Amino acid sequence: MGKEKTHINIVVIGHVDSGKSTTTGHLIYKCGGIDKRTIEKFEKEAQEMGKGSFKYAWVLDKLKAERERGITIDIALWKFETAKFYVTIIDAPGHRDFIKNMITGTSQADCAVLVVACGTGEFEAGISKNGQTREHALLAQTLGVKQMIVACNKMDSTEPPFSEKRFEEIITEVKSFIKKIGYNPATIPFVPISGFNGDNMLEPSANMSWYKGWSVERKEGNASGKTLLEALDCIIPPQRPTDRPLRLPLQDVYKIGGIGTVPVGRVETGVIKPGMVVTFAPQNVTTEVKSVEMHHESLPEAQPGDNVGFNVKNVSVKDIRRGSVCSDSKNDPAKESKSFTAQVIVMNHPGQIGAGYTPVLDCHTAHIACKFAELKEKVDRRTGKKVEDPPKFLKSGDAGIVELIPTKPLCVEAFTDYAPLGRFAVRDMRQTVAVGVIKGVTKDDGSGGKVTKSAAKKK
């Protein structure tokens, strides 16, 4: 057995008809976890329904439909392999929870693949004021997806087909707008493809002999190649934040007979191990960790990404709950957030947001109403320039800096300190109306909390 490949997550973004499904379907189909039987079944159905031309998208639509209906389909279907990586597609933007998932960090993408359609008129529609191309790219940037690949799709439908002039025209335009939102075009591969016919997907295309390949320059090393698959292989794998102080947002707290209180959650940063003295915020309860378990096996130490249960001494189920954050009491312990400033993007709010608006925020596992206490400034979402300060209102499409005050105790962190605890979705009227990234937090000084005996002994 060789060394297991590194796992990376990608998110595929772009305008509604850019061909995301076909492109993604093609990768999964050719390099992925779908077995031949399933593919043949899908193909036969597609043929019978006269959808033969949608072969790859059809594969994806079937998966999506099953996922939408809540059938837990084999998750391997959303994975494929490159020479270096196991790649998981964490979400397709057509999926209604896409934005919420990106923010609440069920999924942090390592790289965004931006698909743009190159057909006559298609690119222009996607990148227009109302198109989703810019919005998705801005969202990826705001949520801290640092790497990007641009797939210039539908090269087979340019005039004339596979036109070099059209490709150049499009990448000039895309470079200009992604630069405005904060990406450096020199670090981004631009690949002309046909997701449907397979040009430059896995093998270099004979139809675009003019294309000399993509190349990127970055501090981790330069890279070049010809295909989309090679571009995916050049993603810089994420550094797991093991060396940061512990942050573990609780998903649940169980009371288990004969054992006691067992909080459960995913380690986001740092490590947790038996014997450690931990503090739960915002409750400010300090205690000792007796044992740490994953998949019913006890662990000497759990690391970022691990979903664990751990047993704590002398803490009742009433003391802590879902949304509490577990931290190392000796290393930058988590504290209650009295207020915080955030950059927000208003997505689909029917009216306008003004001071006093109090919707529910989903941040890590917490779900708590927070008041927009003050709108500090408005930012043009296309240029990132300040427009008017302080604005009276923010409406759909606006971005701004706001001050938020939780209505109940809450623990969040600045995005730059602890990214998974620094992104949030604003929920109202059963939908995501805005997303945000936390710039700074005013914390409670944390005096006068409950400390159990065993924790006090260890101090």
Swiss-Prot record:
Chief localization: cytoplasm
Entry's Gene Ontology cellular component terms: cytoplasm
Keyword ATP-binding attributed: no
5-glutamyl glycerylphosphorylethanolamine: modified positions: 301, 374
Family: Belongs to the TRAFAC class translation factor GTPase superfamily. Classic translation factor GTPase family. EF-Tu/EF-1A subfamily.
Annotated spans, G3: 91-94
Region of interest: G4: 153-156
One Pfam family this sequence matches: GTP_EFTU
Gene, per the UniProt record: eft-2
Protein name: Elongation factor 1-alpha 2
Region (G1): 14-21
Functional summary from the UniProt entry: This protein promotes the GTP-dependent binding of aminoacyl-tRNA to the A-site of ribosomes during protein biosynthesis.
Annotated segments matching region G2: 70-74
GO molecular function, one term: translation elongation factor activity
Compartment list: Cytoplasm
tr-type G domain span: 5-242
Region G5, annotated ranges: 194-196
UniProt keyword terms in alphabetical order: Cytoplasm, Elongation factor, GTP-binding, Nucleotide-binding, Phosphoprotein, Protein biosynthesis
